Every structure is written in C-alpha cells, then in structure tokens.
UniProtKB/Swiss-Prot annotation:
Subcellular location: Cytoplasm, Nucleoid
Name of this protein: DNA polymerase III subunit delta'
Organism: Bacillus subtilis (strain 168)
EC number of this enzyme: 2.7.7.7
GO biological process: DNA-templated DNA replication
GO cellular component, one term: DNA polymerase III complex
Length: 329
C-alpha cells in the first residue's frame, strides 16, 4: 500500500500543511513544482494530492476508500496521467499526446490532473510545448511537475508553477518508517544513516547482501582493534572476495566510517546517537582507550580511502594502507 497522508505529513510537514490548507480553502494552484533530492517523497505526495483532488468524500485528506482513491492507488484512474521519461528523455510527442488527451472532457468528471516525473529530462521541444500548455491553464486542470534538478527547467516554466521544496529526510524519520515495516532496530538505524531515500532503505533492508556487508564490516573493526596481526589476512581472505565492486567497497567504507563516528560520539557524550548500539561495549572500550585526535585521524583515514577509491588505484593496496592508518590512529 502507498504511503498515507499522515505518514507523508511526518516526512514533509511544511509541504503537506501547505497543500492541506490550500485544499481546505479551495485555493489549489493550477501548477505545482515539487523539487528535492531523490527519495524525499515527491511522487508519493503528488499521488496523495491527486487522491484529494478526485476524492468523492471531498475532504482535505483523501478517504482512501472511495472509488477514485482506489483507482489512483491501483494506477488506473482515467483522468490522472503520469508522464515519465521515454528512455533518457521526455519527448515532445509525449507532451503533445498529453495535450490532446486534456483537450477532451474528463471521463469521470470535469477534473483532470497530470504528473510529470523527472520534468528536468524534457527535451527543449517538449519543454516549449508544455510551456504553451501552462500559459493557458484550465481551472479544472492541475499539473504537478517533479524534479531533482530544478535548475535544468526553463525559468518560464518555473515562474508558472508554485514551487514546493522537499527537504532531505531526517534519519529518525527514516528509521521509524523502517521499524514500522518490521526492519530490526539496529538495521533500521544503520540504513537511516546511509541513505535519505526511504524506498532505497526498504530495498536494502530486504537484501541479504546488505546484512552480510554489515557483518563483514563489524568483523574488520574487531580484527583491527582486537587481533591486529590478522587484519591483513582478513582483507585478503574475506574482505576482497566479498566486496568485489567499487560501489560495494564504498558501501563497506561508509559502514566502517559510522563505527568510528560512534566511537567519537561516546567520547563527546552523545551515546544516545550511536548507530551500532549492539557494539556498545567494544566501541566504548575503544573510546576510553583512545584520544579524540586519534579517532578523528581514523575517521579522516576512512574518508581519504573513500576519495581514492574513485581514482585508478589497486583496491587491495588501498585497503591494506587503510589498515595501517587505522591501527596507527
């Protein structure tokens, strides 16, 4: 089931309050621009707005049970149109087809709504066609444009829309959403600190490889600080065969970075912010036996390794150098 109005309100309170008040006062704009980073709920909010727009109950929040709400939920409402890139771009023909469709009377009512996802990917011709469409708004037609890169849109298109900025999601909000979906608390907290995209976090939580990656990272940390002589063997025999791709290596380094951040959090008295709460005892011991400067150096070493990972380097050599830096502190 799609996200509810209440859930969306918790993720993007400013946006949802503005939409709620506009619906209540019957002052909805004819065109909105939802802009923000990937995973901030722009499409979910657009579909919730569509439900409110078409809902037979007529409230500010959709009832979720009438025929129109259910048809939008299943993606088959005849007067709601979703335009997405065809390949790498949204083409002029797609906008022209939309205009032709909207020149007809609504099949279910006098209302029509269209959503253009990744609006920044419109070709120049498509954007110009849309501009003409926006210049002659119909009072019963609403447009919602969605983008992660508003700077790529024509200024004339932006000026004809009410822009609603979607803020990056706070880790706590993502963590709560994941726990609601039966993700374990320790995994939810880690995921919430690795991505601000709820959908991506949910997908990763269901990926066995992510859990295995976490276990490998914890093992490396333990070897680094409890069995120092085995660290190079671990890199060769377990780390490298498992983290084969650079993107996977980067994820492993991100996880490792968060462990050292936890150590620093304990040192400065922020124990409530720990991500690896199940490692509390070993992390606390590390914190007590180290200076803040040495832990800061370890954090900087991981960040430098991440940076060098994207250049043409031997990854095993990079990891072995990182081991030396982490053990030196």
């Amino acid at each position: 089931m799609a996200i509810s109005w209440k859930e969306m309100n918790e993720l993007q309170p400013r946006v949802m309050k503005l939409l709620y008040n506009s619906i209540e006062k019957d002052r909805l704009s004819h065109a909105y621009l939802f802009e923000g980073k990937k995973g901030t709920g722009k499409l979910d909010a657009a579909l919730l707005l569509a439900k409110s727009f078409f809902c037979l109950e007529g409230g500010a929040e959709p009832c979720e049970s009438c025929r129109n709400c259910k048809r939008i939920e299943s993606g088959n409402h005849p007067d709601l149109h979703l335009v997405q890139p065809d390949g790498l771009s949204i083409k002029k023909a797609q906008i022209q087809a939309l205009q032709e469709e909207f020149s007809k009377t609504g099949l279910e009512s006098h209302k029509k709504l269209y959503i253009i996802s990744h609006a920044d990917q419109m070709t120049a011709n498509a954007a110009n066609s849309l501009l003409k469409f926006l210049e002659e708004p119909n009072k019963d037609t609403m447009a919602v444009l969605i983008t992660e890169q508003p700077q790529r849109l024509l200024d004339t298109i932006i000026s004809r829309c009410q822009t609603l900025p979607f803020q990056p999601l706070q880790p706590k909000a993502i963590e709560d959403r994941l726990i609601e979906q039966d993700v374990s608390p320790h995994m939810a907290r880690l995921l919430a600190n690795m991505t601000n995209n709820v959908a991506e976090a949910v997908e990763l939580s269901r990926n066995d490889e992510f859990a295995e990656s976490r276990a490998k990272v914890i093992k490396l940390y333990e070897v680094l600080h409890q069995r120092k002589g085995h660290a190079f063997f671990f890199i060769q025999d377990q780390w490298m065969p498992f983290f084969k791709e650079k993107t996977h290596q980067e994820m492993g380094l991100d996880m490792l970075l968060l462990i050292y951040r936890d150590v620093l959090s304990i040192q400065i008295g922020n124990e409530d912010k720990l991500i690896y709460q199940d490692l509390f005892q070993s992390i606390k011991q590390h914190a007590l036996q180290s200076t803040q400067q040495s832990v800061t150096n370890q954090i900087l070493a991981v960040l430098e390794a991440k940076k060098r990972l994207h250049s043409n380097v031997n990854v095993q050599g990079l990891m072995e150098h990182l081991v030396l830096m982490l053990q030196e502190g």
